[in-house]
């Protein structure tokens, strides 16, 4: 009987840990920290940039991909156009609110797709390059909060649990600088708490509009040795014409 009670108690502790949540005061503090990370970034309103990816997989040569992104962050509008390799030039993605399409310039057809779709053979998904000001409160609940250090930086360590189908992962842990709220590291987990992916942001650049993570490393934790390095360049924050966020724009590129 004592053994059975011990097993029941252990199971109860595991269940409690799996469903643990913070107080409403801590949750509000966490949401404000996450929103501060967005506010510190340069992506507000319209912007465009070049995204260069280097995909590394054991036993294979490095693969280079390049995209041009146009986004209107306050209206959930995004257009992404592949620039390289030449064989895939003109492929693209279009987002208008909750509708997301991929575009094939050879067939000239649009296909409904998901924000969770990967870019080429990389570890980067569409929602990694999109900037969404309503992401945190709408799609996550606060699971845990603590303070710690990451290298030389004091950080807030925040674990968020997905409450909608929008996030690509069931749970994500963020390591955020205390002095300037910027994400330095992110760990993404499955529903069974298996580490799926690690994101490192070792380099930020300061521009007049805010900070830009100009170097990002995404590691596939299921396939050791696989990673994608992302470099952001050619940033502009000028107002974009509405036609860029249309199917006709993608069709007209080829």
Locate the predicted segments by residue.
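Edge/loop elements at the starts and ends of beta-strands within beta-rich repeat scaffolds
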Residues: 40-46, 206-210
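Sec-dependent N-terminal signal peptides
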Residues: 4-14
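Flexible, processing/modification-adjacent segments and terminal tails
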Residues: 21-36, 42-45, 61, 97-170, ...
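Gly/Pro-enriched, hydrophobic low-complexity segments
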Residues: 111-113, 131, 151-247
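A short, Trp-centered hydrophobic/proline-enriched beta-strand micro-motif
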Residues: 42-56, 77-79
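Sec/Tat signal peptide C-region and signal peptidase I cleavage site
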Residues: 16-20
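Mid-chain, structured segments of secreted extracytoplasmic proteins
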Residues: 66-106, 112
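Generic short beta-strand segments
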Residues: 50-56, 83, 159-163, 218
């Amino acid at each position: 009987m004592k053994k059975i009670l011990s097993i029941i108690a252990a199971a109860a502790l595991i269940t409690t840990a799996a469903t643990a949540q913070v107080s409403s005061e801590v949750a509000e503090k966490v949401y404000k920290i996450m929103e501060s990370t967005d506010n510190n970034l340069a992506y507000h309103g319209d912007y465009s940039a070049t995204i260069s990816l280097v995909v590394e997989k054991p036993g294979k040569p490095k693969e280079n991909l390049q995209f041009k992104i146009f986004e209107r962050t306050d209206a959930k509008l995004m257009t992404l156009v592949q620039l390289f390799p030449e064989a895939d030039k003109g492929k693209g993605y279009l987002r208008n609110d909750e509708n997301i399409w991929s575009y094939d310039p050879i067939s000239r057809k649009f296909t409904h797709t998901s924000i969770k779709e990967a870019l080429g053979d990389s570890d980067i998904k569409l929602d990694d390059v999109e900037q969404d000001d309503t992401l945190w409160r709408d799609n996550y609940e606060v699971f845990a909060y603590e303070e710690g250090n990451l290298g030389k930086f004091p950080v807030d360590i925040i674990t968020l649990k997905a409450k909608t189908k929008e996030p690509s992962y069931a749970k994500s842990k963020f390591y955020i600088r205390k002095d300037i709220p910027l994400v330095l590291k992110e760990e993404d987990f499955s529903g069974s708490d298996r580490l799926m992916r690690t994101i490192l942001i070792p380099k930020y650049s300061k521009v007049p509009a805010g900070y830009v993570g100009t170097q990002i490393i995404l590691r596939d934790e299921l396939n050791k040795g696989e990673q994608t390095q992302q470099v952001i360049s050619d940033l502009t924050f000028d107002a974009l014409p509405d036609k860029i966020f249309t199917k006709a724009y993608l069709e007209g590129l080829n």
